[in-house]
Swiss-Prot record:
Record: residues binding Mg(2+) 3: N497, T501, E505
Keyword list, A-Z: Cytoplasm, Lyase, Magnesium, Manganese, Metal-binding
Tissue: Predominantly expressed in flowers and siliques but also in roots and leaves.
UniProt xrefs under InterPro entries: Isoprenoid_synthase_dom_sf, Terpene_cyclase-like_1_C, Terpene_cyclase_plant_C1, Terpene_synth_N, Terpene_synth_N_sf, Terpene_synthase-like, Terpene_synthase_metal-bd, Terpenoid_cyclase/PrenylTrfase
Stated name of the protein: Terpenoid synthase 19
Entry comment, domain topic: The Asp-Asp-Xaa-Xaa-Asp/Glu (DDXXD/E) motif is important for the catalytic activity, presumably through binding to Mg(2+).
Biological process (GO), any one: diterpenoid biosynthetic process
Molecular function terms from GO: magnesium ion binding; terpene synthase activity
Amino acid sequence: MEATRMGFGGLSVPLSLTPNLSLIPQRLLDKHNLSLKPVKIHHLVCVRSTKSSDDLETSRPSTYFSPSLWGDHFLSVSLDHAEFVELEREIETMKPLVKDMLMSSQSSDKEKIRLIHLLVSLGSSYHFDKEIQDILKHSFTKLDGIIVEEDDLETISIMFEVFRLYGHKMSCDAFDRFRGGDGRFKESLAKDVRGMLQLFEVAHLGTLSEDIMDEALRFTRNHLESLTSGNVSSASPHILKHIQNSLYIPRYCNIEVLVAREYISYYEQEEGYNEILLKFAKLNFNFCQCHYIQEIKTLTKWWKDLDLASKLPYIRDRSVESHLGGLGPYFEPQYSLGRIIVAKTIMIIVVADDTYDAHATIPEATVLTEYFQRLNIGADDKLSGYLRIVLESVFEVMGEIEQEMSPKGRSYSVKQVLERFKIIAKAYKQLTEWARKGHVPTFDEYMKVGLVTAGMGDYAGYCFIGMEDINEKEAFEWLNSNPLLIDALNVLFRIANDVGTYETEINRGEVANGLNCYMKQYGVTKEEASRELRKMYIYNKKVVVEEFMNSHDRVPRQVLLRCLNFARLFDVIYTEGDGYSEPKGKIEHFMTSLYVHPIPLS
């Protein structure tokens, strides 16, 4: 089970060039020195075909995915426009009350930061983003004085989280006061359940050089697990449930809106909760949910009109799951159009991906790739059959998005996304060749291609299209500068995806899987390979946090926050296997809580 449950919850380059592997795999592989281990083959899956080379060239896999969980369900869900209006009216009525709390001159810096943390937890902070940034900018200049005599673990941990989330790198030295003479965290801290939980959460915001955060994570996890597994506990039931949820998916391994949905339920059971803040959070969530339902209705109708699920029965029919792919980066109502664009783009790219993975022969994959390089089918071309359907669908959908965004002056982003797709198509073709021939490349060879198909630079580009609050050309200039943040995200996605899909990919003959390739190159078992990939995952999670922190002086926070949220989404999707392809179970539960059940206001 370790291989399929690891707790996960680039900039595309021509294949003729070597992607930036300074982070992984080479540096990590050198560090772990696995190549010096005696080579011993354990359970390596390698297809030995008796077919001729010509047969392999034209072989077609017989892969079909499970049908959609949702079908046309959301088309029958009624949305009352009057409810939309009333929710928005109530939110606007309450905003000044919450703002007054935030800006109160009677509140200390620590009290304001704790309130900011509560607003973030409840999913309401975006309403006051400018005010929050101003407060934190001012408070950070006098941080030493604020914390000099603070000995409350929860308070220090909250301040650490809030400052880091908003781009202020509060030093982890602040936690030295909670360590004993032996350098370890004091065992007496275990009695402070709230402080321990908060330290556990912020330990996920450590960077590469901050070993104390690794120690904090081990220390808090051990004690919190003991607390929840014991028969007797002094903690309240709602706190124990909150701890169990956090141990399963920590806050920064979960998407913002799911954190808010769970935290609202928890906060309502807290003694002395603030009624105004709770009601504001509930109204806000239900208002967001109305937006999500309307967006999914739009996507469902659009997808149904395309009729690709029946024309191309081998593809994944995942409109609601694709919306989750847009919701992860940004959940706020103002990004409604952005979520629709991201979801449409994901769905149409999945059509291409599934064609390469699950249906095309090698010659067909070659033809497909050639047309993607041209970004045009051409009137004189005699392309027929399903390949024409795939190509026309991709080009037409991206053309529709460009046409929609052009009046807003944002067609540049769409052109950039298409240019980047030329490169990812070449990588898809390489994976197709390996799969059809049953070839298991070395891990190093595989990652040169796999980091391209991870496509995090492309994913960021999808998000930029609908972000009207950023300068799209500047955002793509940063994206095209080979940022380390995107490199690390590519590694995270590739590892999470390959581990989460290992069993299903191997069962359908796709032996060029990162886990399988690692087993081959280093002669280790699946369990050993899983552990090493997990180390790479943790390492690159820290890189993401570090680059998020270090880039605020030159990259807009709205851009960086999307990237941080990508990593959180991977942890959700791949918590138990591949939640996108097989959403039945945990992902279905998450989607139901977000899209089906509103929060009762009383």
